[in-house]
Amino acid sequence: MFRSFASPLALVATSAIASNPATTAQHQGSFWIQTFGCQMNKADSERMAGILEAMGYHEAPAELEADLVLYNTCTIRDNAEQKVYSYLGRQARRKRTHPHLKLVVAGCVAQQEGEALLRRIPELDLVMGPQHANRLEALLTQVDNGQQVVATDDNHILEDLTTARRDSTICAWVNVIYGCNERCTYCVVPSVRGKEQSRSPEAIRLEIEGLAARGFREITLLGQNIDAYGRDLPGITPEGRRQNTLTDLLHHIHDVEGIERIRFATSHPRYFTERLIEACFDLPKVCEHFHIPFQSGDNDVLKAMARGYTVERYRRIVNRIRELMPDAAISTDVIVAFPGETDAQFQNTLNLLEEVGFDQVNTAAYSPRPNTPAATWSNQLPEAVKVERLKQLNALVERIALQRNSRYSGKVEQVLAEGINPKKPQQLMGRTRTNRLTFFATEGPQGCRYSPGDLVDIQINSVRAFSLSGTPCEQTRSRH
């Protein structure tokens, strides 16, 4: 859907806006972007911030001081969606006394609700789905012309035309595939993110080369289902396989000078291949950290979720990773209290957590989402069961995480310093190759001082469930 309104009551046909060239009008106002949800949303927000700065906007010191407020929203769980409406209500009240304020809702709630958002919050100026992030300037031009705009049509995503305003100068998100073609029965992502659209390997490498030239040292390749990268691109190899896969992309970008670390997320067990595992082992810049959601440790629940794999397949993936890379970190996502989940099936999930020994786990109790099959089923579990199972799950996750981190005590780990610890300015914080958050002093042996962007060898002397602390060793690789 693509609509713009001269007022909340009058419809103006402007569907051609999607192909209009961006304007060059300069704005003197300020903006504030609030991001909810996943890494894809964070990357989209960086892109939109870059567009706004190119238009002449500057970032406001606080949300309530901004001339343009943009909420980049998430609908994967109900509590995230309700939080957005709370923020919007506050800004809608503000706009009644500050009519110059531009109020924008982007992301998945915008895609899901569309024009209904205008009826619920008539103070909105722009409602735009995630496929329109790169069209922000053209859409705001319509707003400047006095129209309310809804942009939720299923569009080909424009190649990145504007330099993103990165929230870090060390680590960068790089979108490589948008959308998702899976049909998991609980998930709203395909209906709000659209079908899979892979960027070309050439465009991705060009972006990464630009990041390296600006001093970035780590990149994370992003996709809702990153293992599906390239299956919508043309080309077959003489061996009969797809010419463009995530494995091929890793080889294609690996030699970009200046980039020290490469990560990727999020993987799907159904498409996680032996060839990909071997590439991660062979390519030294690819970090030994794999985010592979398993969602449930019970095959019947996985079938009801339409996940397309079994617990046995998941085990084989984990075993092969650890066979080649024994110290690799594996993180995951888990949903408990899915409709119809029995006590025994829940216990199977806990058993798999114990068996694998995950390093990090994103946990959630099932939340019915609009336009998903599971939301219509009659075997929904009581809220009390959801709360209790999530409580048990989180307790186990924390215990396992502490056990896994305890293995690092006394060891020396290479840490990429990402910034100052906001709670202790005398400390830097960064991550190991296995994605452990690590804190250490800004000053090392013999008065050596470290800065964000340095690769520092840290001797770990304190472990917690979700972070490490340590002391710098002499060896360091400066960013400069």
UniProtKB/Swiss-Prot annotation:
InterPro entries: Elp3/MiaA/NifB-like_rSAM, Methylthiotransferase, Methylthiotransferase_CS, Methylthiotransferase_N, Methylthiotransferase_N_sf, MiaB_methiolase, rSAM, rSAM_horseshoe. The gene is miaB. Its EC number is 2.8.4.3. [4Fe-4S] cluster 1 binds at residues 38, 74, 108. Monomer. GO terms for biological process: tRNA methylthiolation. Residues 406-474 form the TRAM domain. It comes from the Bacteria. Catalyzes the methylthiolation of N6-(dimethylallyl)adenosine (i(6)A), leading to the formation of 2-methylthio-N6-(dimethylallyl)adenosine (ms(2)i(6)A) at position 37 in tRNAs that read codons beginning with uridine. It holds the Pfam family UPF0004. [4Fe-4S] cluster 2 binds at residues 180, 184, 187. GO terms for molecular function: 4 iron, 4 sulfur cluster binding; metal ion binding; methylthiotransferase activity. GO terms for cellular component: cytoplasm. This is tRNA-2-methylthio-N(6)-dimethylallyladenosine synthase. NCBIfam families: miaB-methiolase, MiaB/RimO family radical SAM methylthiotransferase. Gene3D superfamilies: Methylthiotransferase, N-terminal domain, tm_1862 like domain. Residues 29-145 form the MTTase N-terminal domain. It is found in: Cytoplasm. Belongs to the methylthiotransferase family. MiaB subfamily. Its cofactor is [4Fe-4S] cluster. The keyword 4Fe-4S applies. It comes from Prochlorococcus marinus (strain MIT 9313). PANTHER family: CDK5 REGULATORY SUBUNIT-ASSOCIATED PROTEIN 1 (PTHR43020), MITOCHONDRIAL TRNA METHYLTHIOTRANSFERASE CDK5RAP1 (PTHR43020:SF2). Binds 2 [4Fe-4S] clusters. One cluster is coordinated with 3 cysteines and an exchangeable S-adenosyl-L-methionine. The lineage of its organism: Bacteria, Bacillati, Cyanobacteriota, Cyanophyceae, Synechococcales. It catalyses: N(6)-dimethylallyladenosine(37) in tRNA + (sulfur carrier)-SH + AH2 + 2 S-adenosyl-L-methionine = 2-methylsulfanyl-N(6)-dimethylallyladenosine(37) in tRNA + (sulfur carrier)-H + 5'-deoxyadenosine + L-methionine + A + S-adenosyl-L-homocysteine + 2 H(+). Keywords: 4Fe-4S, Cytoplasm, Iron, Iron-sulfur, Metal-binding, S-adenosyl-L-methionine, Transferase, tRNA processing. Residues 166-403 form the Radical SAM core domain.
